[in-house]
Amino acid sequence: LEGDGVVIKGTKKRLEFHRYQVCEDIINLSKTRRKRVQAKEFVSLSRLDALQEIKAYLANTYDLSNTLIISNADGGAGYAKKDFDEIVGYCRQHEHFLDVFHLNKKIKDRLSFMPAMQGKLISAVEFKYDRHLTDVILDTIESNLIDELNTPENHENLRRLRSYLHRRWVDIKTFKMRHLSVIKAIGCCESNTYRVKGQGKYWSEDGAEGILRVLTCIKNNELEYWLSSEFAGGQLDIGDQEELKGAVRANL
């Protein structure tokens, strides 16, 4: 179970669409290609709408009382473990992971003033998962904030990074260290992000919502069913047909 938010260009302001995706397993098609089993995606400009859709799908499709749930997200607003607890409801076990891509980016962004320490901190946090060593490295960085590095901005970035790592320490623990009896099937959400944001377009809210709905149905193999339903007629407002064609081509 994964989720993320993606910002796209809007005609009046930036728009953010929210996506949750779920699958039962991942199988290897080749050395470089994997396929999700029973994958479903739920996307909307409204996080609450997407959240309610995936909650309803899980409740109506699965009995999770004896199921291990593995979730993965960037930890932003609406994507913390408690949010996924709400989606899942009652289950046998829920293991939540902080997305490694976003963790690395956070460390590099916050330590942009001291690149030489980025790799050391990433190693201590992700590969060794050593809380004491992590604190030692952070203390070392702080002690080296002298001369031109001794700025309020650098001190604030370091303080915020330390707080970020402490708050999310449990979620940072690696898949291998948790000794789970399943294969790693997370980390797909970022790589599967729709190319709507790469179309060079400025989307209206109605146009973006309509195209996201169509693309989600394509991903879920439900387009024909959805377009023939009464629900589609009141929700679909594509606008520019060229926008639709470009976005669809990018996702086929």
Report the location of each language-model feature.
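Hydrophobic/aromatic beta-strand patches that form the interior of the parallel beta-sheet core
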Residues: 1, 96-99
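RNase H-like nuclease fold core
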Residues: 1-70, 77, 82
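Acidic/histidine-rich catalytic cores and adjacent linkers
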Residues: 56-93, 100-252
